[in-house]
């Protein structure tokens, strides 16, 4: 049951300095367009090319969809607010944004772990890859990703909706996220904080450890490669993947592992930008555009568009 007496929230945005609004607007617009178009290109390439049918490309397609939902649920509203100075969001709109963002956050973390496992099987058991990562396994893994993400998002959104917001209603952030909403609550938030800790430990820290374990086995397998060029290419791919994963998990763990009383929103807004915009922009470049088959698929898309 919703006990809220607040019908809308005021979003302060990234900065209160008017002279920086133009620069921030342009930066976020460009990065959002790069993220959106990059991920959309992956989706089109996967759908258009029948050769991209292995589980890895299904996971990349799913990651692209998740990244588009993550950025689109936040950035357009933020840019619109900066253009019109209409910095309010309805209670329902705020809860919807929170649900979509929390869903994408959970889905992305579990997807990173799933993709790391897929690469582990492909590199460490190449002869058995098609047997292990068959259609049923792929469907099961994707179902697990969606189930965990939806459950995580539903629980956190429901716990936020049970809180009483009686004023003030000003969110010192650029979107509706759990920490700033907890800071506005007039009712106890202990249960919310406990569930955030549980989710952070199981999803963020747990998935990060599992992902690192998979890449650890991959690195051991790479060390057995005899050619220097083969090792170099494999290490280059692994290091870029681990960089993106670390860049994503670190700010998420940092943001959600602390009690609400310790939040410093000026700093946390910059940290949030890493996992809401920077990582979704880097994902296509690191995971897809370096792949030869995906490059060939993208070239086919551009060739089709020319005709």
Swiss-Prot record:
PROSITE patterns: G_PROTEIN_RECEP_F1_2 (PS50262). One of its GO terms (molecular function) is olfactory receptor activity. InterPro entries: GPCR_Rhodpsn, GPCR_Rhodpsn_7TM, Olfact_rcpt, Olfactory_GPCR. GO terms for cellular component: membrane; plasma membrane. Disulfide bonds join 94-186. SUPFAM superfamilies: Family A G protein-coupled receptor-like. Residues 44-51, 118-136, 215-234, 290-307 are cytoplasmic. The chain crosses the membrane at residues 23-43, 52-72, 97-117, 137-157, 195-214, 235-255, 269-289. Gene3D superfamilies: Rhodopsin 7-helix transmembrane proteins. Residues 1-22, 73-96, 158-194, 256-268 are extracellular. It is a multi-pass membrane protein. Its main location: membrane. The keyword Nucleotide-binding does not apply. Keywords: Cell membrane, Disulfide bond, G-protein coupled receptor, Glycoprotein, Membrane, Olfaction, Receptor, Sensory transduction, Transducer, Transmembrane, Transmembrane helix. Belongs to the G-protein coupled receptor 1 family. PANTHER family: OLFACTORY RECEPTOR. This is Olfactory receptor 13G1. It comes from Homo sapiens (Human). The lineage of its organism: Eukaryota, Metazoa, Chordata, Craniata, Vertebrata. The gene is OR13G1.
């Amino acid at each position: 049951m919703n006990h809220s007496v607040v019908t809308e929230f005021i979003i302060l945005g990234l900065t209160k300095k008017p002279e920086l609004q133009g620069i921030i607007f342009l930066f976020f617009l460009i990065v959002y367009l790069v993220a959106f178009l990059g991920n959309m290109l992956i989706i089109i390439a996967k759908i258009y090319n029948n050769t991209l049918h292995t589980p890895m490309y299904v996971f990349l397609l799913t990651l692209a969809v998740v990244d588009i939902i993550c950025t689109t649920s936040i950035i357009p509203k933020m840019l619109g607010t900066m253009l019109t100075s209409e910095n309010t969001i309805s209670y329902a709109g705020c809860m919807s944004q929170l649900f979509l963002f929390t869903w994408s956050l959970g889905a992305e973390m579990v997807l990173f772990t799933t993709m790391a496992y897929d690469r582990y099987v492909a590199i460490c058991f190449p002869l058995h890859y098609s047997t292990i990562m068959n259609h049923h396994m792929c469907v099961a893994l994707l179902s697990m990703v969606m189930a965990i993400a939806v459950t995580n998002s539903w629980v956190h959104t429901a716990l936020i909706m049970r809180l009483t917001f009686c004023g003030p209603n000003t969110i010192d952030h650029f979107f509706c996220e759990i920490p700033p909403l907890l800071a506005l609550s007039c009712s106890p938030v202990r249960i919310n904080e406990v569930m955030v800790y549980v989710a952070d430990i199981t999803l963020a820290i747990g998935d990060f450890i599992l992902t690192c374990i998979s890449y650890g086995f991959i690195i051991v397998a790479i060390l057995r490669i005899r050619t220097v060029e083969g090792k170099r290419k494999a290490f280059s791919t692994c290091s870029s993947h681990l960089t993106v994963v670390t860049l994503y998990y670190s700010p998420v763990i940092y943001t959600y592992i602390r009690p609400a009383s310790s939040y410093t929103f000026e700093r946390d807004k910059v940290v949030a930008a890493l996992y809401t915009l920077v990582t979704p922009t880097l994902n296509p470049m690191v995971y897809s555009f370096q792949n030869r088959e995906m490059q060939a698929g993208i070239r086919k898309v551009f060739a089709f568009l020319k005709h």
